[in-house]
Structure formats: structure tokens, C-alpha cells
Amino acid sequence: MGKKQGKQLSDLKKELELDQHKIPLEELCRRLGTNTETGLTSSQAKSHLEKYGPNALTPPRTTPEWIKFCKQLFGGFQMLLWIGSILCFIAYTMEKYKNPDVLGDNLYLGLALLFVVIMTGCFAYYQDHNASKIMDSFKNLMPQFAFVIRDGKKIQLKAEEVTVGDLVEVKFGDRIPADIRITSCQSMKVDNSSLTGESEPQSRSTECTNDNPLETKNLAFFFTNTLEGTGRGIVINVGDDSVMGRIACLASSLDSGKTPIAREIEHFIHIITAMAVSLAAVFAVISFLYGYTWLEAAIFMIGIIVAKVPEGLLATVTVCLTLTAKRMAKKNCLVRNLEAVETLGSTSTICSDKTGTLTQNRMTVAHMWFDQKIVTADTTENQSGNQLYRGSKGFPELIRVASLCSRAEFKTEHAHLPVLKRDVNGDASEAAILKFAEMSTGSVMNIRSKQKKVSEIPFNSANKYQVSVHEREDKSGYFLVMKGAPERILERCSTILIDGTEIPLDNHMKECFNNAYMELGGMGERVLGFCDFELPSDQYPRGYVFDADEPNFPISGLRFVGLMSMIDPPRAAVPDAVSKCRSAGIKVIMVTGDHPITAKAIARQVGIISEGHETVDDIAARLNIPVSEVNPRSAQAAVIHGNDLKDMNSDQLDDILRHYREIVFARTSPQQKLIIVEGVQRQGEFVAVTGDGVNDSPALKKADIGVAMGIAGSDVSKQAADMILLDDNFASIVTGVEEGRLIFDNIKKSIAYTLTSKIPELSPFLMYILFDLPLAIGTVTILCIDLGTDVVPAISMAYEGPEADPRKPRDPVKEKLVNERLISMAYGQIGVMQAFGGFFTYFVIMGECGFLPNRLFGLRKWWESKAYNDLTDSYGQEWTWDARKQLEYTCHTAFFISIVIVQWTDLIICKTRRLSLFQQGMKNGTLNFALVFETCVAAFLSYTPGMDKGLRMYPLKIWWWFPPMPFSLLILVYDECRKFLMRRNPGGFLERETYY
């Protein structure tokens, strides 16, 4: 089954290979047994339906909800807590068997662990329950019905009953019900943006215009929309075999794997488990050697294992991630999967789509050429750029022609909105010109009303121009305006307007035109030419009837007024965001379905290709040599066409990804986007992918973190993604990266803080076993630390600010969430000082009450025996069992208070890993509150009446709070000295051994 699935997945990753668009229509009809006039017969349709299956997407195998819930309940860190809980119940049962009057400490601890694991499991399941439902979102794109010609009759069928060979009919507003070969059409345009990323409407025809099935004009694809006109076509693929079906199957079949934070927690579990089991085994053996029974040794072993488990850590990590997710949502990054919060911080490469992510997703007039000069239009989102061109003599004429020679109109319901935010009836280029003209003139409709249109030749693909005839403002006659492909417009002109004067269009002026046209086209911009002509009043008097079908007016010998070029301009914040990525060690790769020239131009504008860095094409153009003669290694950047990528093997792609830091992939298919992501992952990189179309969904799913667009993104891309950018802005990703890296550092600090207290919690049990010392702290008291006083301070680390500017992405092999240096600091250094502080307090109180240290060592058996009701202390005073227990529980409380006090300083030193506390400051208000909070909780547990019976916590004399304070101060001084020496000697011994 696994091999079959793997084979199917590899087939889906292959480029689409079709010949149905290239072969003659008659041959296609013979192959499919159909007819271009009458379609299939009913019997043929039934046979084809059985052969090819229904026109529907096959749902992937899904995991039952109860299994998902069990995975959350028993996976990873939860398993460690389950084991701890079970061991507590076993220890309690053993103690109960040995002594029926045993206290229920282990029972309470087991129940507490059970509660923690069930609650965190339920929370994780709730988060996961909202995750990927990719196939459902594909099904939402399915048309409900389709019009089909069968037996020569037009009938309406359910879309899933359409089969290969059917002759289908579509019109404006219809969704294409399957992959079809166009047999006839009239002014048909389709929206392929969700499939190819091409935002412009694509015209359809019966002619094969490209070998690539995604770019030819005689195919229309399942799920895409008909925007204009009507058409008929023969179905060539249905359901899973359609282009969109292949993408759906590919996206739903991919396994995105474990997130970096999940792998880190798994690594942490291995460390903690190994240490706990090893330590427990060692002390079990020591217990035997000291003469303890196997039952006592087993209880000791279980106690040590449980004492090593950080019970509150899972809840702490979950809450930290949740808080960061909420913070990111306020910055327009909506997280669908909690673990993705940290994954974005681990990102070392971003594969970004162009349209709408790096750019504004609106065509805008970028440049103009008039009066023999190229001027830059204001493309800023708030119109704050340079507008000096408005004073030029040729500008008003160019704007007049652009305003009049257009069918585009603003939608009336958006009249109250700013010009750039209004919707337009018309295609993207028309909308760009209309908005630019509106902002330049104040009111295009006013110009049109004063110079009314009387006739029009609409734009068509054969002529490549549009003409309209208008009344003069003074009603004295007519004039015409024309726009279209620049070369077509120029050939119809005999004069040109320069600085308000009409001069002959000679060879010099044509050369100036060609230079400007090439320069604008080389910037990846769509260029249109504009011209006009004053119709003589004696030949075209008022009331003249203009014929648009057989023009009875001149459409040559016109006056050229200028060029306008349009582009979807970069977002204002993107260049700075790309620069920040670079400084943070993140490689940004553009992966787009757009044309290479346009992609390269935008890449240069946003900084993906740095200023002065050349591609092989640039070098070839500069040296005036063929591209084949350029050494690829001499180029600093690469622009790879999808057709070239198709012919590459994995090694060639890997070589490009390794060698170039600046890469643009253009004209890529969905499968190629996926192959690029897999190639980057082979380099050991963590990959973030951005996208908005259905075509992006496989790459979004495969990436370490998929980032979909919230505004322009399709439902499919959002379901495949881990994160959604609510403002569709690439700059928001950088914010997410900064937050992700910060939370990784802060979770690391939180773990360091949490683990440190395990040593003072564990050491009393070791002293109990090794030196027969009466127990200095109880299990319930430990629980009050792990699930009480330590939780809020640990969570407060999520609010800690960064120590420095965005750092380089971490090396997942070398930089772990928990490493040996963190363990060494928490357990071997700070934890040991805390244990000394706790025992110092313990001995002070015991000594003050009569038991000096030399009396306490070896006293355990008599201390715990109810038979001794007259145990003497160092001064000869006799102690009953009840009095001894009251003193013991008072010491437990004091040890607990001592841990809280030394944890004050531990929390403060964990704020930074390198900087001094005095450099970082105490600006984290939540952490400051946490210090007060844990102190209040400790005081509440100690002094609240009834706690002596519930938790065996006893009120302390006020001066018993002071013995641990010197140790707390010692920890602060020690750590400040360590960090000072680390900063003085970067990379030295201290940094290598203690910097975690």
C-alpha cells in the first residue's frame, strides 16, 4: 500500500503531459468517440462514465476523530506525564500495602498529572480539529450543474455526471465543469488566476497557441470561471485526472511532517527520560546497598522519576505559543496551527509568490513617455510620490486621450471610497488607467460628459487597438482617440505631439519611440500607445453618422501623443522587509507564474535581486555575446524559466539553490513549485512558502510553514496553509519571523527557569536515601511549586523582549531547544545553589528548634517511627511523633518558600542569555507581576488557616524567609559575572560551556 501511494504521489508530481490540445480536432473526436455537433450518445456517455468514473474528486483517507484525540492525549510529552501519573499510583499502592495509614501525597500527585495531561490533550485536539480540510475547500469550487450536448440535444446535468467526450457549453458567469478542448467560442475569456497565478483574464480560441497545456488558448480547465463570452468544448479529463484534480490530490496526499518545535520537544523528552531513568536506577541500586527493602527502593525510584518530570512545562509551552499567536494576530498574522508560531521563527528560506504578496495586486500606471522623456508616475499606495510631470505640456493631452478612449467605469456603490480603493467595471489595465486619470483630472466622468462618445470600435485581438469618436467640448465638430499596442498605434500615426507642438513623425522620432518602448518593456511593464486626430468640420459636420463596422472616418495619419506603461507595483514596505530578511539570514526566493521579465523587474525593485547583481542574461547583454557563452558561475543572481526547470534533474536544481543567494523562478507550474520547495528542504533549510491560488496549495502543504493570503487567497490555499496574512503583505511575514524567533528564545528561557527548581526538589529525596535525613520537602509541596508558583513566572517569559536585532536562523542540528549547556546551567550550577539555599533554611529551622545537623544525619528511621514518642534532640528535649511531624511539615513549608525566593533571582537571570540584567532592564511588566504573584501564592499557602490540614503547609516566623536570600543574591552575582566574562571573551570557554 505504501509503495502504491508513493508511486501515485510521484506521478502527481510530474509535469502535466497532454497532447489533446495539439492534435487535430477530428483526431480527438475519433479518439474519444464523440462529435463536435451532437456530442456523445446516451449509451456512450454511460460507458464512458463507467470507464472514467464520476466527475468528482476522490476524498483522501481520513483519520477517525477518536484516533486524532488519542494522538493528542498520548503523544510526545503527554506520554511522559502519563508514565509519571501511573508511577505515582503504583507508589501509592505500594505504600498503602506497606502502611494502611500512609499519607496520600503520591495519589494527589498522580491525579494532578492526570488532570494536566487530559486538559492539555483536549486543548491540543481543539487546536488541531480546526486544521486541514483541503479537499472540502476544493469541493466548494465544484459547479453544481453543467449544460451538455448529448444525442444532439442540449441538456442540464449534475456536474459529476459529465464524462470524457461530452460536448459542454459554457457562458459568462459559468464555472468550467471539466478540462475541455475549445471547439467554438465567441469573445470568451476565463479566469486562470487560481491555476496559473496569471491575474489578467485569458482569452480563449480554437487554435493551439502553445505546447504547454497551461498556456495554450484552446483549453479551459475544471474549476476556472468564464468571465466573458460563450464557448463549447469537448471534455478531455474529469475528476482526479483533471489539472485541478491532480493539484487537489497532490495537496491532500502530501505529509507536511513534524514541526521544528514538535521535534525539539521530542528531543527534550528523550533527555529528561534518560536522565530520570538513569538517576532512578542508580539510586535504586544504592538503596539496596544501604539495606532498604525492594519495596522501599521501588518507591524511592518512582519518587525520583516523578520529581524529574516538569509537570507544568507542557501547559507553559502551550500558553506561551497561544499568547504569541494572539500577538501575531494583532500584527495581521493569523496562526491556524499553534506550533507554526515557532516554525516561522526557524525559517531560513522564504519562497514567495509575487502577485499580491510582494506587489499591491492592482495594476497601476508606472511610467509615461511624452515630450520625448520617460516620467515616473506616482505608484505609492497613499499618492505621496513625485508628481512634477503634471506641469508638462504633453501631459494633459495624454490624460485626455486615456480618459476618453476607455470603457471602464467606477462602480457607483463605491463612489464614497478613495479612488485607489474603488472597484471598476473593466479589466485590470483599464482600471489602472481610469484610476490614474481620475486622480490626475479630478473627474473622468466630467471629461466624458463634456466630450460625448458618438461611435466606437472595440478592442479585439486582431486589430489590437480601440477607437472612439467624440464631440468637441464646444460642439463644433468631432475628434477621435485611439489606444492599443504601441507598435500598432505608431504605424497609424504621421505626426507626434512634442511640448504642445505637432511635428512630423520622422525616423529620429521613431527611434526615440523605440528606445522608450524597449526601456519600458524591459522593466516588465505592459505598455500602451495613445493617439488622437481632429476630424475636419467640413467633412464631418454635426449629425454625421459614423460607421464602426466599416469605418467611414480616418484611422491612419493620426497624431501620436504618448505611451503609458502599467505594472502591479511593489508594496511600500516590501523592500525594507526583504532587507530585514537578509540581515536576519533568511534567503528570499521569488516563485511566480508570471513572465520572467516582469518577475525580474519586481525582484530588482524589492531587493530580491540586489542592485548591481547580474543574471546570465544581463552579462550576455552587457558583453554582447550569446547567453550560452556566459559562465553561469559569474552571475550573482538567477532567473529560471519553468520550461528550463522542467528539463532539470534534482542535482541540477540543488546546484542552483546552493550556488545562488538571489533566485527568481518564473512561469512555474504547481508541480514545479512543489519541486522547488522539496529542493530547498534537501539543502537542510526550513522553508516558508507564500501563496494565494489553488495552484499554490501543494507547495503550501509541503513547506515547513505555509503562509496564505487572507484577502486575495482562495479557500483551498487557506486550508493548506499554517498561517494566514490578513493584509496580504510580505512585510507581515517578517514580523512573524521576529515573533517566532523570539518565542523560541523565550521558551528556551522558560524551560531553563522551570528545570532549575527540579534540583532543590530532588535533592531532599537523595539526602533522605543517602544520609537518612528527615525529608526536607514533601511531594504535595513540590506540586505546589510545579503547578502553582512556577507556572505564571514561566509563562511571563513569553512577554520578554528580544536581547538584540533579529538573529540568524538557528541551525536545527546544533541549536536545540534544550541542550547539554542548558541542562548544565539549570541542574549543575543554578539548581545546586538553590538546593544549598533550601537546605540552609532547613538546617536553620531544625537547629533553632533543637535538632543540629549532626543529630539529623542518620535520624530518619527513628524520626518516622511512631513507636518513638520520646525522641531526644541535640539539647535533650523529647519530641513526640506528632510534634516531629509538625516540625517536619514546617520545614517542608520553609523549603518551599526558599525555592520561591531563589526562583525570584532565577526568573530575573533567565530574562537574558548574554546581556546583563542592567542592559535588558525590568521592562517586562508581566514578569514583574509574576514575581509578586508567586510571592503572594507562597504567603497564601503558608499563612491561610486550614492549609495545615489540606496541604500540610504551616505558618512560618517572618525571619525564616531570610535565610535563602543570600543564596538568591549569590545566584544573581554569579550569573552577572558569567555573562560579563562571556561578553568580554566571545566564543571563549564560558560561552562554549554555558551559553544555551
Curated annotation (Swiss-Prot):
Q: Where is the active site?
A: D353 (4-aspartylphosphate intermediate)
Q: Which reaction does it catalyse?
A: K(+)(out) + Na(+)(in) + ATP + H2O = K(+)(in) + Na(+)(out) + ADP + phosphate + H(+)
Q: Summarize where Mg(2+) binds, as residue positions.
A: D692, D696
Ordered alphabetically, the record's keywords are: ATP-binding, Cell membrane, Ion transport, Magnesium, Membrane, Metal-binding, Nucleotide-binding, Phosphoprotein, Potassium, Potassium transport, Sodium, Sodium transport, Sodium/potassium transport, Translocase, Transmembrane, Transmembrane helix, Transport
This protein's GO CC annotations: plasma membrane
Report how it sits in the membrane: Multi-pass membrane protein
SMART domains in the cross-refs:
Cation_ATPase_N (SM00831)
Q: Which InterPro entries match?
A: ATPase_P-typ_cation-transptr_C, ATPase_P-typ_cation-transptr_N, ATPase_P-typ_cyto_dom_N, ATPase_P-typ_P_site, ATPase_P-typ_TM_dom_sf, ATPase_P-typ_transduc_dom_A_sf, Cation_transp_ATPase_P-type, HAD-like_sf
Q: Where is this region: Disordered?
A: 191-211
Q: EC number(s) per UniProt?
A: 7.2.2.13
**Could you name the domain of life of the organism this protein comes from?**
Eukaryota
Q: Where does ATP bind?
A: K483
Give the UniProt record's GO annotations in the biological process aspect: intracellular potassium ion homeostasis; intracellular sodium ion homeostasis; potassium ion import across plasma membrane; proton transmembrane transport; sodium ion export across plasma membrane
- For this protein, the parts annotated as crossing the membrane are 73-93, 107-123, 268-290, 297-325, 762-785, 820-847, 889-909, 926-951
The primary location reported for this protein is membrane
- PROSITE patterns the UniProt entry points to: ATPASE_E1_E2 (PS00154)
- Which terms in the Gene Ontology molecular function aspect does this entry carry? ATP binding; ATP hydrolysis activity; metal ion binding; P-type sodium:potassium-exchanging transporter activity
Query: Pfam families, from UniProt?
Result: Cation_ATPase (PF13246), Cation_ATPase_C (PF00689), Cation_ATPase_N (PF00690), E1-E2_ATPase (PF00122), Hydrolase (PF00702)
Task: Tell me the enzyme class.
Answer: translocase
- Entry's localization field: Cell membrane
Functional summary from the UniProt entry: This is the catalytic component of the active enzyme, which catalyzes the hydrolysis of ATP coupled with the exchange of sodium and potassium ions across the plasma membrane. This action creates the electrochemical gradient of sodium and potassium ions, providing the energy for active transport of various nutrients.
* Family, similarity comment: Belongs to the cation transport ATPase (P-type) (TC 3.A.3) family. Type IIC subfamily.
Subunit architecture: The sodium/potassium-transporting ATPase is composed of a catalytic alpha subunit, an auxiliary non-catalytic beta subunit and an additional regulatory subunit.
- NCBIfam families the UniProt entry points to: ATPase-IIC_X-K, ATPase_P-type
- Annotated protein name in UniProt: Sodium/potassium-transporting ATPase subunit alpha-A
Which organism encodes this protein? Answer: Artemia franciscana (Brine shrimp)
